[in-house]
Curated annotation (Swiss-Prot):
Function: Regulates G protein-coupled receptor signaling cascades. Inhibits signal transduction by increasing the GTPase activity of G protein alpha subunits, thereby driving them into their inactive GDP-bound form. Besides, modulates signal transduction via G protein alpha subunits by functioning as a GDP-dissociation inhibitor (GDI). Has GDI activity on G(i) alpha subunits GNAI1 and GNAI3, but not on GNAI2 and G(o)-alpha subunit GNAO1. Has GAP activity on GNAI0, GNAI2 and GNAI3. May act as a scaffold integrating G protein and Ras/Raf MAPkinase signaling pathways.
Stored CDD domains: RBD1_RGS14, RBD2_RGS14, RGS_RGS14
Protein name per its UniProtKB record: Regulator of G-protein signaling 14
Organism: Mus musculus (Mouse)
GO BP, sorted A to Z: cell division; chromosome segregation; G protein-coupled receptor signaling pathway; learning; long-term memory; long-term synaptic potentiation; mitotic cell cycle; modulation of chemical synaptic transmission
Record-annotated membrane-spanning stretches: none
Gene: Rgs14
Length: 547
């Protein structure tokens, strides 16, 4: 019956996973109403919530999945959560949260200690030269001037953002991680939890020894092959099968996952839904692999790439095999409102050459990359009847962006006029490139100044020899090349008519001289028979024999 735990004949100390999905859902729903989203920041004011089917004293690990606030109240749970964040390279979030907790406990009258702790927190987590910077948005940035008048709640907004980031992002992955599943299984079997950071669960002294059997005897039904612990007992007193225990474990975990998915995800912090969906699918495949006894390769955590965005913030991207760098960054750029074609990707420390986005993203595992935004606009060259695409850094001015195209055509800034289509007023070349992003500009020249390519067209182009032009355009970016090809086809009427007769004569001449060898052309006039092959009458200096 919903609302009461199913005892199943399990002893009091082992009733960790014997709970139905409906109980977890109802408990989570009532708890969600009692706990405000991100409203309780201090660990001393975290709500206790309604009664839980898990006793926090006897089953503390199972209670960690109830809520993020309950996890923070347990020192052991907070230590395991910190260890999990270290593996994800984001331990600075929980470290910053704990530092803010200690800072709020300082009395407001103790201005000296407040100033010292505020200085330490700011320069370690919030300044532009911080050793462990946290990921907060621009609205929560603080200047160093606020340290002159410290208050116990001066970091409340920043702590709230990090709290929401951990609650709706990191905590969701923690309850699905193999680390939490190990702790949950150890508690279900009665084994002591290992210390966070060690490699084995339980100590060798406290672990039970394998039962010794007499000759001819076998282990009873339900006891694991390694003989560490007997399994939970069923209603008839017989131990439950290992597969049934796994089903109970999976059921409790699925209940916790469903409860987490029912919560609100409208957080002010960054939350990559596509990334969470992938983590959920990885957790599901890991659970299935445990149930079927397959390899443990699915449970291995993937490697991440640290991505520094143009606005100064950072994000973690999972480097999955089989995905390109373009696919890995597509979700981050879409979430931040960035156009991926206008982004250049550089390795931190090697910013001379941009990375190719079509290679496998596993090359960036455990690496740091920096994204630089590029401003693109189209420039219509009136003298050439051509449209080119220009990409430049946002910090550049218009005259700096136009310098390469002007140098290519042999022009200077004094000989051109830049304006928008339909306007005659020239634009100020000192304006930044960001002011003309995604626009089309017109580059006009006075009548006395002509572009070099418009004045001196190569004979090959005037005769319509397209292979050389295509070879030149093939080195340009695809967008530029396509634009150039379109302009070339649109200006066909300005070209000179090809000499068809001369072209036919040239083709005939090429066909007639098609047979070559190393000695030259093989023509009939050039064929000379060797002397030993000639007839006696054809040999030079030969006389006819008398009749």
């Amino acid at each position: 019956m919903p609302g009461k735990p199913k005892h199943l004949g399990v002893p009091n100390g082992r009733m960790v996973l014997a709970v139905s999905d409906g109980e977890l859902t109802s408990t989570a729903g009532s708890q969600a109403q009692g706990e405000g989203r991100g409203s309780s920041l201090s660990i001393h004011s975290l709500p206790s919530g309604p009664s839980s089917p898990f006793s926090t004293e006897e089953q503390p690990v199972a209670s960690w999945a109830q809520s993020f606030e309950r996890l923070l109240q347990d020192p052991r749970g907070l230590a395991y959560f910190t260890e999990f964040l270290k593996k994800e390279f984001s331990a600075e979030n929980v470290t910053f949260w704990k530092a803010c907790e200690r800072f709020q406990q300082i009395p407001a009258s103790d201005t000296k200690q407040l100033a010292q702790e505020a200085h330490n927190i700011y320069h370690e987590f919030l300044s532009s030269q911080a050793l462990s910077p946290v990921n907060i948005d621009r609205q929560a940035w603080l200047s160093e001037e606020v340290l002159a008048q410290p208050r116990p709640d001066m970091f409340r907004a920043q702590q709230l953002q990090i709290f929401n980031l951990m609650k709706f992002d990191s905590y969701a992955r923690f309850v699905k991680s193999p680390l939490y599943q190990e702790c949950l299984l150890a508690e279900a079997e009665g084994r002591p939890l290992r210390e966070p950071g060690s490699s084995h669960l339980g100590s060798p002294d406290t672990a039970r020894k394998k039962p010794k059997l007499k000759p001819g005897k076998s282990l009873p039904l339900g006891v694991e092959e390694l003989g560490q612990l007997p399994l939970a007992e069923g209603p008839c007193g017989r131990p439950l099968r290992k597969s049934f225990r796994r089903e109970m474990t999976g059921g409790a975990m699925n209940s916790a996952l469903r409860r987490e998915s029912q919560g609100s995800l409208n957080s002010s912090a960054s939350l990559d839904l596509g990334f969470l969906a992938f983590v959920s699918s990885k957790s599901e495949s890991h659970r299935k692999s445990l149930g079927s006894g397959e390899s443990e390769s699915e449970s291995r955590p993937g490697k991440y790439c640290c991505v520094y965005l143009p606005d100064g913030t950072a994000s973690l991207a999972l480097a999955r095999p089989g995905l390109t760098i373009r696919d890995m960054l597509a979700g981050i750029c879409e979430k931040r409102g960035l156009s991926l074609p206008d982004i250049k990707v550089y390795l931190v420390g090697n910013e001379q050459k941009a990375l190719v986005l079509d290679q496998d993203c596993t090359v960036l595992a455990d690496q740091e990359v920096r994204l630089e935004n590029r401003i693109t606009f189209q420039l219509e060259l009136v003298g050439l009847e051509r449209v080119v695409r220009i990409s430049a850094k946002p910090t550049k001015r218009l005259q700096e962006a136009l310098q390469p195209i002007l140098a290519k055509h042999g022009l200077s800034l004094d000989q051109v006029v830049l304006h928008r289509p339909g306007e005659k007023q020239p634009m100020d070349l000192e304006n930044p490139v960001s002011s003309v992003a995604s626009q089309t500009l017109v580059l006009d020249t006075p009548p006395d100044a002509k572009m070099s390519e418009a004045r001196s067209i190569s004979p090959c182009r005037s005769q319509g020899c397209l292979p050389r032009t295509q070879t030149k355009d093939s080195h340009l970016p695809p967008s530029s090349s396509s634009l150039l090809v379109e302009d070339a086809s649109s200006s066909t009427g300005n070209r000179q008519t090809c000499d068809i007769e001369g072209l036919v004569e040239l083709l005939n001449r090429v066909q007639s001289s098609g047979a070559h060898d190393q000695r030259g052309l093989l023509r009939k006039e050039d064929l000379v028979l060797p002397e030993f092959l000639q007839l006696p009458s054809q040999r030079p200096g030969s006389r006819e024999a008398p009749p």
